[in-house]
A protein has these predicted regions:
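Charge-rich, low-complexity N-terminal segments
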Residues: 1-56
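Intrinsically disordered terminal and processing segments
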Residues: 36, 41, 46-54, 60, ...
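Structured beta-strand/loop patches that form or line metal/cofactor-binding pockets in enzymes
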Residues: 60-117
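A long amphipathic alpha-helix within ATP-dependent nucleotide-binding catalytic cores
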Residues: 98-101, 105, 110, 154-156, ...
Length: 201
């Protein structure tokens, strides 16, 4: 692990692109260079994975505008009583879930809005799985996602894939830099990062 550099507290607001303000937040976070870690708690309807609690830590890479997390929950129960399985419920360690984001960085305050496209990146040799390109296309078609934001998002998404997942031209047996080394120091910080804020759904 690289030597610890000075870190800065940061407040994070989270939502989907086009959501009205205020978004969910402010969430306690810590900045380390181009990476930010922040946390929030899930409600009791979410059952945590073995050895985990309902406190979800998420990382932002501000250079490419993506958020990544290993989901802390095993399954959730809806208000109607239906069971929703989490990511990789049959695996000891879930794949990382990576979201394309629109990030507004104001220094001590960061606004992160979900831009629909996701990829699941396992660390056990399984292949990646790209998700929700249809939702991205629907948002453009419906007028909810302006063309300039869509173009910028796709360019940043390709840069994320090329930098962190598959840097070489041809496929390799391992990811280029995933989980990113940039989050190592943040991942080692004890929880909670600050006052716990619970997501109410």
């Amino acid at each position: 692990m690289e030597p610890m550099e000075p870190m800065e507290p940061v407040a994070v607001w989270q939502g989907r692109y086009g959501d009205p303000v205020p978004l969910f937040g402010p969430l306690p976070g810590v900045r380390d260079g181009r990476a930010i870690a922040y946390e929030y708690a899930l409600p009791e309807s979410f059952e945590p994975r073995p050895g985990r609690n309902r406190l979800q830590r998420t990382f932002l890479l501000t250079d490419v505008g993506v958020a990544l997390a290993q989901p802390c929950w095993h399954r959730a129960t809806t208000g109607a009583g239906d069971i929703v399985p989490g990511v990789d419920p049959g695996q000891d360690e879930p794949a990382w879930y990576v979201d394309l984001m629109h990030v507004t960085d104001r220094g001590h305050e960061v606004v992160a809005r979900d831009l629909y496209i996701d990829v699941m990146v396992p660390t056990d040799g399984r292949h990646q799985r790209l998700l929700d390109l249809d939702e991205f296309a629907d948002a453009i078609e419906d007028g909810g996602l302006p063309a300039d934001a869509a173009v910028d998002g796709l360019r940043r998404w390709q840069r994320f894939l090329d930098t962190y997942v598959h840097r070489d031209r041809d496929p390799r047996a391992a990811w280029s830099d995933f989980p990113p080394k940039a989050i190592e120091n943040l991942a080692a910080l004890p929880s909670p990062l600050g006052p716990v804020v619970t997501w109410e759904g």
